[in-house]
Amino acid sequence: MKIRENIENFERIKLNKVAKFSDESVGRERLEEPDEIRTCFMVDRDRIIHSKSFRRLKRKTQVFIRTYGDHYRTRLVHTLEVSQVARTIGVALSLNEYLIEAIALGHDLGHAAFAHIGEDVLNDFLPGGFKHNEQSVRVAKKIEKNGLGLNLTKEVLDGILNHSGFSNVSKVAGTFEGQVVRFADKIAYVNHDIDDSIRAGILKEDDLPKNIIEILGASGSERIDTLVKDCVFNTIDNIDKGEPRVSLSKEIGDAFVQLRKFLFDNIYLGKYLEDERKKAEFVLEKVIEYYYNNWEEMPDLYRNICEEEGIHRGVTDYVAGMTDDYCTNEFNKIYIPKFVMY
């Protein structure tokens, strides 16, 4: 018997009835022979980790520009924290940890440079709009491996596509594992963005709303502990009641929504970051403008996309894949003179 089959048989014994069993995967767009020692979701996890898009996350901003300090989260650190939170919840619920890990590690592959500023600029540029979750799926299906894509399982792609959205009415993933990643993403970024904001001097601990802190906890570790345990126990209650969905309790969920709103009002859309936001927007807009008018200068992959799907699409794919550093260097290369000739 193959090692993979042993693992799949063990899943039948170990995992919750609502979990996604590896041997019941819907499969991939292109058929492949099963691996001898890894389940299909292990294979997906490994492909994501070894992808170029995953490596570039280390030089993409989460909220604060990386050059401001060594301890601010990058998009890669955020991704790893999401994976950790999601796996903790998933193991407690006896879900498929490998599926959770693959979705979590791949959920932001398509995120643009300069955090959500990049997403907003590309959304204005691309007809039909730009969303990082949709771009993450596109990266996995079409951009990676010079246009061949990673050929991930449909469960992983579904989890990546549906990881966004905060309200209970948002479209959710088709697997419990995907739903767990959706909550883990929010739990991770709300808490680490508070931590980074305090480090940057934008917030003080005393600025956090007292009524929310009394419910969720005063420190980041306390809040994560509260949210993770509430998610686990409330989801178990849902399953026992015949309502198979991942969710927070009303009290914790309402407090969490209020805390997220506080972050939007005071950090993401606050005045402190306004000047830096304008600079990043300017750099992105000028790089986009240049390549829209000179798309023949882009690498072969993106030139081919321009010819097949239009210049807007090809330029969007190229710029969306840029790191903060690469985008800034492109701006300097295009617009800043290296020397002056008399």
UniProtKB/Swiss-Prot annotation:
One of its GO terms (molecular function) is triphosphoric monoester hydrolase activity. SUPFAM superfamilies: HD-domain/PDEase-like. Keywords: Hydrolase. Residues 75-190 form the HD domain. CDD domains: HDc (cd00077). It comes from the Bacteria. The keyword Hydrolase applies. It holds the Pfam family HD. NCBIfam families: PRK01286.1-2, PRK01286.1-4. Belongs to the dGTPase family. Type 2 subfamily. This is Deoxyguanosinetriphosphate triphosphohydrolase-like protein. It comes from Clostridium perfringens (strain 13 / Type A).
